[in-house]
UniProtKB/Swiss-Prot annotation:
Essential for the assembly of the photosystem I (PSI) complex. May act as a chaperone-like factor to guide the assembly of the PSI subunits. InterPro entries: PSI_Ycf3_assembly, TPR-like_helical_dom_sf, TPR_rpt, Ycf3/AcsC/BcsC/TPR_MFPF. The lineage of its organism: Eukaryota, Rhodophyta, Bangiophyceae, Cyanidiales, Cyanidiaceae. It comes from Cyanidioschyzon merolae (strain NIES-3377 / 10D). GO terms for cellular component: chloroplast thylakoid membrane. HAMAP family: Ycf3. This is Photosystem I assembly protein Ycf3. It is a peripheral membrane protein. Belongs to the Ycf3 family.
Amino acid sequence: MSRSQKNDNFIDKTFTILADVLVKLLPTSQNAKKAFSYYREGMAAQAEGEYAQALESYYHALEFEEDVIDRSYIIYNIGLIYASNGEDEQALEYYHQALELNPRLVQALNNIAVIYHKQGMTYQDEQLLQKAAAYWRKAIQLAPGQYLEAQNWLKNMV
């Protein structure tokens, strides 16, 4: 195992232990604790490429999570899984749901733009490319220092 992998494993284990301690110490409801536990399980499964298990954990987390912003991240992660599996329409659906809850979720804006851009290039569809541009503009407006490739693409598009 390389040093980098050892460090990553150490960090993952440290995060897990720290998260367990925080969940036990912080004054949160039982539902919030269950939601967080399922969310962590989902993240771990997703990181290992166990997408079916990750989805199951995320759906359980949604049953218990009451915080709108936290729900948006769970839904966003579900979208990531669908995108990873090439299910762009499903991914778009979840990214849009995440944005309804959290309009400042720039990662969702970017990922929507990426899908529209890919579809626009594949089908030579100017409307899809315009949609991609609109979502990238929103993402760049919220996070000006990020998405440099998108900024360059937008400059060349004009």
